[in-house]
Amino acid sequence: MVLSPPVANSNLRTVTPTGGDPETVYVEYKPYKPRRGASQPSDAMIHRVRALGNLLCQPSALDAGFHTLSCRCILKEKDCNGRALNRYAFLFRLPEGSSGEPISLSAAITTHPSHRPTLGQRFQIAKTLATSVFQLHSVGWLHKSIRSENILFFGPPDQMYSQQYLVGFEFSRDENDTSTTEQDDVLERNIYRHPDRQGPPDTRFSVLHDIYSLGVVLLEIGLWRPVIGFEAFEGMDPDAIKDRLREHSRARLPHYMGGKYTRAVLECLDETLADGCVAALGGLERFRESVQIAFSEKVLGGIEGGVALE
């Protein structure tokens, strides 16, 4: 199997199986640090990659509401001279009927003002994303990188907001995996992260951190503006940013999306879905299940009513 060289600013590459026809695929990368004194990744990394591959290769994942691309295969990538690049390449099949580069939600909001979605389309985008997060959590999986650049649309120009998929699984892991890997400190990414997860994290990642990130993206969808442009966040501490996002939600969302949607977003940002749930008492799985029940009722339930609007 031969994978074409990467192209700048594109995740699309061509893979040619031995004796087969070339196929365009969407590629994501998962870097790894070789074990000390060796060229191979750690056993924990190998297990993590296999587990993620098993999840994303499930043919029924899309039908179940995951809205993730189907993983074709995983390669340990090498450069043109055969040297290991210390990263895995996840090769995803493109959706049927897709053509050309997908567009991210981030790009759609910032660079396509003439293609603003209808009110009903905004509700549908929000519902599809919230359903993706719900389904991932239902199988005990954490995404860890929910932000608008990791939501892609593969639809044709006249149906721009169709064929929506959640990508960006570089840091994703099983909820029982206690590894800590997402340690960059960039405001454009931090603004989607819970305050506890900005900079070197000192708390274990949980479903509530994913749900907080979802709330930030839902705020962007509702106002159809990039959250980074709301005001000058540079220099604010993480808790102050969180407070400002909550204030923007309360003050601005009701006019654009209504009270139910606003309350759904605030449930995500306020972490109230965990009220009455104590992980230590019933174990991690019991805690997740309790949060899932509240999420279905208060977040998905708050969004679904607007999908039929035009």
Name the predicted role of every residue range.
Residues 210, 214-215:
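Alpha-helical D-x4-[hydrophobic]G micro-motif in the C-lobe of protein kinase domains
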